Amino acid sequence: MKSCKATKIEAVLTMDSKGQILLPKELRERAGLKAGDRLVAIAGCDENEEVCCLILVKAELVDEEMRSIIAPMLKGVVG
């Protein structure tokens, strides 16, 4: 699995009335995303269990190693 070397703010997104967000074309191209690609949304929660951040990961990158890292976080969400 590739590891990220750096993070930065790429775009400010707006949600429409249908709950959809649009990733800017330049970002989609840089990420190699195309129509029909699947993304996994990982939610980070604060001490009050309020979602404070979302991370999007290409579904094909969610391998067993990543699942083992995510699993403990999901226990708190799904019980």
Swiss-Prot record:
Disulfide bonds: none annotated. GO terms for molecular function: DNA binding. NCBIfam families: lp_hng_hel_AbrB, near_HgcAB. The keyword DNA damage does not apply. Gene3D superfamilies: 2.10.260.10. Signal peptide: none annotated. It comes from the Archaea. Transmembrane segments: none annotated. Keywords: DNA-binding. Residues 10-60 form the SpoVT-AbrB domain. It comes from Archaeoglobus fulgidus (strain ATCC 49558 / DSM 4304 / JCM 9628 / NBRC 100126 / VC-16). This is Uncharacterized protein AF_0476. The keyword DNA-binding applies.
